[in-house]
A protein has these predicted regions:
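Beta-rich, blade/repeat-based domains predominating
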Residues: 31-46, 76-92, 122-144, 174-195, ...
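Short loop/turn segments that connect beta-strands within beta-propeller blades
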Residues: 63-68, 108-112, 160-164, 210-214, ...
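Surface-exposed loop and turn segments in beta-propeller and other repeat-based domains
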Residues: 23-32, 74, 114-132, 164-180, ...
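WD40 beta-propeller blade core
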Residues: 61, 71, 105, 115, ...
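Blade/loop signatures of beta-propeller domains
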Residues: 2-24
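Loop/turn-rich, solvent-exposed surfaces of beta-rich toroidal or solenoidal domains
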Residues: 192-193, 222-273, 278
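Residue position within the beta-strands of beta-propeller blades
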Residues: 51-52, 96, 147-148, 198, ...
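Short loop/turn segments immediately following the C-termini of beta-strands
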Residues: 54-55, 99, 150-152, 190, ...
Length: 303
């Protein structure tokens, strides 16, 4: 649970869930290994850290856990946005969403495209491919996967492992079952049965759905424009891009929720306080982040 590589560095967080920061991790020469937007990161089965950027000189940059450069690949994803890893036990696969090309790809760990998903034309909202601007994916253990169309028509699309559409739900709208900004999605295995947790970023909430798309719960996070939920152990982690709204640049932090969906710690954010069961509005408290977009928690608990 620590990023402490240096001693006597500031500690961030609350309620015993605290971290110190190593600002030198992953520092590379930007002329040789440039990064435009650092959108998401995952850890593979070898323990390496993969970074996704929409810089087409090197869309995927791979580091070892100490932050040293290993390799990079990818020149064909100008809108690289969402990065999800599928670990089968035998090999790893990546799912990348491209908001500029209006596509989602299943890719080998070294960059070979295996499957391409285009706009689902059978759904009326997607008669034009430009309506499909996918931001995130989540993969079930059986290989089926979900796509969150967070910058497009706001549908959640469920596919089998071969890429055939099975179901869709959500869409843009005002009711609780609809979305305004379905920016992120993950599978939550912490309960008796798996469920989906989906971001509605501009509304400052996570929404829990059954795997077949039935709304189960809304988790209110006032003031927090949360990106994708990331679950590690009993905790849910999320980057808060901005607070209290998307119009406030350079105002982000990282939030951590326990399995009761209570915010227990904020890195760079205000101390979480509840009154009569309701969370007080959150905000940036320390400028250690500008506009954080994702959280990757490694196998040692470092962020």
């Amino acid at each position: 649970k620590n990023l402490f590589i240096r001693e006597k560095t500031p500690v961030y967080g609350h309620n015993g869930i605290t971290y110190s920061m190593n600002t030198q991790w992953g520092a590379l020469n930007p002329e040789k290994t440039p990064v435009n937007d650092c959108h998401e990161m995952v850890q593979d089965s070898k323990g390496r850290i993969l970074l996704l950027t929409n810089e087409t000189k090197n869309n995927v940059i791979i580091y070892n856990k100490s932050g040293s450069y290993v390799e990079s690949w990818g020149t064909e994803f100008p809108g690289a946005h969402g990065l999800t890893i599928q670990k089968t036990g035998k090999e790893d696969f990546l799912f990348i969403t491209d908001t500029a090309k209006h596509q989602v790809y299943k890719i080998t760990i070294d960059g070979k495209i295996l499957l391409t998903i285009d706009a689902p034309a059978d759904i009326p909202a997607y008669q034009k491919k430009e309506a499909f601007i996918p931001t995130e994916t989540a993969v079930l253990d059986n290989g089926e996967f979900y796509i969150a169309d967070g910058y497009g028509a706001q549908h959640i699309l469920h596919y089998d492992e071969k890429g055939t559409l099975k179901n869709s739900f959500g869409g843009k709208g005002e009711g609780d079952q609809f979305f305004d900004n379905a920016h992120g999605i993950c599978i939550d295995y912490r309960g008796k049965t798996p469920t989906l947790i989906i971001t509605d970023r501009t509304r400052n909430v996570f929404k829990r759905f059954s795997l077949d798309g039935k709304l189960m719960e809304i988790i209110h996070l006032p003031g927090a424009c949360v990106c994708r939920p990331v679950i590690k152990g009993d905790y849910l982690y999320a980057a808060v891009l901005r607070s209290p709204s998307l119009s406030e640049a350079d105002s982000g932090f990282v939030t951590i929720l326990n399995k009761e969906n209570k915010v227990v710690s904020n890195l760079g954010g205000s101390e979480p306080k509840y009154e009569n069961g309701k969370l007080n509005p959150l905000s940036q408290a320390e400028k250690i982040f500008r506009n954080p977009h994702d959280v990757c928690v490694d196998d040692e608990g470092s962020i």
